[in-house]
């Protein structure tokens, strides 16, 4: 039986052997692995890019105080970004499942059309959900736009839901029962040992104790600072500005979880973040162009 961490190790090794640069998680709160600059920003411009990484993802509204067996406000994704998207991307994915001990000839694996959109990033793509014996475990996306800019060449994204894959492989129905690791003395460290307390306390904060007034001020401050950086002409500050956009995005998600934003206000906030994302995307492409798109081998 593969432990949670062994699944990660195997995916890292598999994609490294396929030519991907295995990088580390982004050190900020994001709602999905897509928001890591290694996918979102690298999808822009003509430079090739092949990377794989684990990304902790936060969705405050999905917290359930640690009581729900398969719904979390903090979880893990394994992200693969392939640009340009190879013609055999689905075959590569199926090979990665074989590496985990999942034989496509034995199991019911279906690709279900499901196009993707992230309104706050001004991003969308054509894609599929991958269902393994009736459970969604992966999302495929061919990026079409980020920040309103066309992606040329198209980046192919594969996003594995690590918890769901692990629950299937280990045959458990409660995420907290997953075996994360085995210790040298033979003891088992479970997912619950690692994260149950975090789910309880973060859910309590997200829904009951977060300060809506303070969060609103934070959102406005992040937005103002991002605009200030984007207005600088004598230096490229696309990456610091993008981090401020992500901070604004997470703050918005906390406000949403707290119930502090009305339906009408929600659309307005999303529009404000999207406007920043578009400006960042433009600045990022300009900065790479000034560098001569260095990843394009002459």
Curated annotation (Swiss-Prot):
Major enzyme class: ligase
Protein name as it appears in the record: Glycine--tRNA ligase alpha subunit
EC number(s) per entry: 6.1.1.14
Gene: glyQ
Catalysed reaction, written as an equation: tRNA(Gly) + glycine + ATP = glycyl-tRNA(Gly) + AMP + diphosphate
GO MF entries: ATP binding; glycine-tRNA ligase activity
Subcellular locations according to the entry: Cytoplasm
Family: Belongs to the class-II aminoacyl-tRNA synthetase family.
PANTHER family, per database record: GLYCINE--TRNA LIGASE, CHLOROPLASTIC_MITOCHONDRIAL 2, GLYCYL-TRNA SYNTHETASE
Keyword vocabulary terms for this entry: Aminoacyl-tRNA synthetase, ATP-binding, Cytoplasm, Ligase, Nucleotide-binding, Protein biosynthesis
Pfam family, one: tRNA-synt_2e
Source organism (scientific name): Neisseria meningitidis serogroup C / serotype 2a (strain ATCC 700532 / DSM 15464 / FAM18)
Principal subcellular localisation of the protein: cytoplasm
PROSITE patterns: AA_TRNA_LIGASE_II_GLYAB
Gene Ontology BP annotations: glycyl-tRNA aminoacylation
Transmembrane segments: none
InterPro entries: aa-tRNA-synth_II/BPL/LPL, Gly-tRNA-synth_heterodimer, Gly-tRNA_ligase_asu
CDD domains linked: GlyRS_alpha_core
Quaternary context: Tetramer of two alpha and two beta subunits.
GO cellular component: cytosol
């Amino acid at each position: 039986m593969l432990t949670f961490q062994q699944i990660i190790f195997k995916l890292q090794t598999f994609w490294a052997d396929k030519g991907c640069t295995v990088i580390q998680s982004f050190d900020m709160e994001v709602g999905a692995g897509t928001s890591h600059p290694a996918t979102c920003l690298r999808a822009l411009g003509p430079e090739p890019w092949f990377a794989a990484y684990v990304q902790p993802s936060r969705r405050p509204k999905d917290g359930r105080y640690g009581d729900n067996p398969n719904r979390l406000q903090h979880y893990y994704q394994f992200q693969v970004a392939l640009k340009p998207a190879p013609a055999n991307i689905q075959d590569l994915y199926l090979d990665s499942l074989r590496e985990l001990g999942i034989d496509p000839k034995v199991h019911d694996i279906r690709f279900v059309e499901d196009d993707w959109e992230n309104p706050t990033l001004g991003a969308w793509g054509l894609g599929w959900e991958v269902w393994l014996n009736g459970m969604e475990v992966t999302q495929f996306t061919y990026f079409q736009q980020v920040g309103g800019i066309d992606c040329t060449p198209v980046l192919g994204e594969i996003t594995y839901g690590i918890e769901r894959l692990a629950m299937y492989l280990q045959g458990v129905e409660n995420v907290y029962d997953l075996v994360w690791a085995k210790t040298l003395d033979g003891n088992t460290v479970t997912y619950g040992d690692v994260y149950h307390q975090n789910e309880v306390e973060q859910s309590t904060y997200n829904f009951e104790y977060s300060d809506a007034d303070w969060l609103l001020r934070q959102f406005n401050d992040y937005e103002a600072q991002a605009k200030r950086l984007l207005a600088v002409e004598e230096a490229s500050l696309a990456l610091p500005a993008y981090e401020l956009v992500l901070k604004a995005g997470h703050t918005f998600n906390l406000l949403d979880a707290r119930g502090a934003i009305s339906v009408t206000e929600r659309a307005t906030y999303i529009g404000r973040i999207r406007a920043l994302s578009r400006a960042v995307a433009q600045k990022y492409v300009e900065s790479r162009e000034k560098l001569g798109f260095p990843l394009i081998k002459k």
